């Protein structure tokens, strides 16, 4: 099992998502899947982000159609690092 580590920015963005009515149960469900390294269901549309120096090994998935989780698995140290969460426009200014 991977230890879950939340980036400071993630914590702030997650509080904002909850205030907007996003479900903590949905976040907990996907964190359980990721931390236990289970197969991620297709509905989450998990994919790698552009592989630049800043985003090396960073992935994104859709908790809901416009609620995203950006994360990185650091298997050598057994960590699931939650980097960002929010809408497309929150995260990518779209």
Regions found by a protein language model. Name each.
Residues 23-27, 42:
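A structural signal for well-ordered alpha-helical scaffolds and beta->alpha junctions
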Residues 12, 29-32:
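Generic recognition of well-ordered alpha-helical segments
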């Amino acid at each position: 099992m991977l230890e879950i580590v939340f980036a400071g920015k993630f914590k702030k963005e997650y509080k904002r998502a909850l205030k907007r009515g996003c479900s903590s149960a949905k976040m907990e469900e996907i964190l359980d899947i990721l931390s236990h390294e289970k197969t991620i269901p297709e509905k989450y549309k998990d994919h790698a982000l552009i592989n630049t120096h800043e985003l090396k090994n960073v992935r994104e998935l859709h908790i809901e159609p416009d609620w995203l989780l950006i994360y990185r698995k650091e298997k050598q140290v057994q960590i699931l690092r939650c980097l960002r969460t929010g809408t497309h426009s929150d995260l990518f200014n779209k």
